[in-house]
Amino acid sequence: HMILNSNYYHALLNSIIGQQISVSAANAVKIRFFKLDKNMTPKKLLKIDIRTLKKIGLSRQKIQYIKNISIFFIENKKFINKIDQYDESVIRSKLIDIKGVGNWTIDMFLIFSLGHSNIAPRGDLGFNKAISKLYNKKLPLNDKYLLKIYKLWTPYNSMATWYLWRSLDPIPISY
């Protein structure tokens, strides 16, 4: 079953760490990252030396992105404290302004932190691979086809996505 991460800061950091790398590589970096401080906060992260973050496996770009998230959390406490009360479009419009946070990261956040039930991360490679396999379609899948699948699975796209990922890798993903 899917486990929600109620620590929104950690969830967004985990999504950045997990961008464009395998689940096992992401998990290894996450373990090293949280060994630095299991109760990482935005203020603590901003004090960590770049060399330390590079040693645990973060690229210079990902380091900048997690710093951007840290600054956002410091500057937007009211929004963060009430984020679960906003609808998807408001959350997307606010988070997309953080450099390094794109639709994929927001999709992961909506699924794994806020528990939104109808998110289909169409830009996710695993999601697309699993649909390709399930429906015997060649990659890359076009947007029109993905939209058709999205409508078919509404309002349960998040659950369908989770099971699609499980069809490729039995290790549950969490962010």
PLM features per residue range, with description:
Residues 21-22, 26-97, 152-154:
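Alpha-helical ds-nucleic-acid-binding substructure associated with the helix-hairpin-helix region
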Residues 16, 32, 94, 130, ...:
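Generic structural signal for isolated residues within well-ordered alpha-helices
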